[in-house]
C-alpha cells in the first residue's frame, strides 16, 4: 500500500526522468503553439468575438469529454494515457497548420482533437504526480516540477515567436507536432506505475470535500483564460498591433518569456514556504495580488509595462497555484477515489474557462472591442477572488 501511494519515493531515476523529459517536451510543443493560436486565427480573418466563442466551444467540449476520458485513463493507466494524448495532438497540429481563412472544415476537428489531448493529459498527469504525497516535502516536489515546466514554457514562446516571424506561424505548428512525437518516446521505456483497469467511483463520493473548493476550482479555470488567452490577445491586438509581417509573434514571445527567471525563483521559494506550513497564507496573499494585476491590465498601453505586469502576474499565479495544487492532491488522497476526484475537478475548472470565454464573447458583441476587454479584466479580478473561498483540510491542521 505504501509503495503504491508513494510511488515517487521508490521510483528509479529512469522512471522519474522519463516523465520529466516527456513533460518538458510536451510543454515545449504546447507553448510553441498556444501562445500564438488566437493571434493566428485573428490573422486568418476571425473576429475577436468569433475567437472568444471558439474557445468557449473548445472548453465546453472538454467539460463533456473529461469524465469519459478519465474512465479511459482508469482503464489503461495514466502513463499510457499521457502517451495517447501526445499522439492525438500530432494530427491536431497538422490540421491546424492547414487551416485556411475562416473555413471551419479543419479548424473544428483540430480544436476537438486538441481538447481531447489536453484534457486526457491534464487528468493523467495529475493522477501520476499527485502520488508525490509527502507530508514534509510535497511543496518542494511540486515546486521542482513547476521549475521544470516554467523553464520549458518560458523559452518556448521566444523560440516559437522567432520561427513564426521568420517562416510563418504554420511552421511553428508543424514543428510542435514533431516535438509531440518525441515527447511520446520516453514513455515507451518502462511500465505503468499504478494499477490499471480501475473504474470511476461515484458511490460514497466525497461531495462535501469537493464543495469546499468547487467555487475556487471554477475561479481557477476562469483565471487561466483571463491571464492566458484573453491577455495575450489583448496585448497582440491593442498594444503591439497585428500586422502581415508576423513581427507580432516575435514580440509576443519575448513578452511572455520574461516570466522565465521570475517563475523559477518563485517556485523554489514558494515550495519552501508551503513545506513550512504557510501554504494557506501564501495562497491568500497571492490570490489578492493576482486580482490586483487584473485590475491594472486595462491601463497598460505599451510593451515595457506588459513585461513588468507579466512578471508580477507570474509571481501571483505561481503563489496561489502551488499551495492550491498541494491541497487538491491532499484532498485526492483523502477522498479514497483519486482518479474520479481529479476528473471531477477538471470538469469544474474547464467550466470556469468556458464561462470566461463566453462572457468575453458576449461583451464583444455589445461593447466596443477594447472596452469589452478592459471590462472583462475587471470582472476577472472579482472572479479570481473566489479562490479565497477554498477550504482545505490540509490547511486546517
Model-derived segments and spans:
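A membrane-interface helix-boundary motif in multi-pass transporters
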Residues: 165-178, 245-247, 358-384
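C-terminal transmembrane helical hairpin of 12-TM major facilitator-type secondary transporters
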Residues: 281-321
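C-terminal ends and interior cores of transmembrane alpha-helices
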Residues: 87-102, 288-302
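Multi-pass alpha-helical transporter architecture, strongest
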Residues: 2, 68-70, 180-194, 375-397
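Substrate-agnostic recognition of the 12-TM MFS/MFS-like secondary transporter fold
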Residues: 18-35, 58-70, 88, 110-164, ...
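Helix-loop boundary and gating motifs at the non-cytosolic
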Residues: 2-63, 209-255
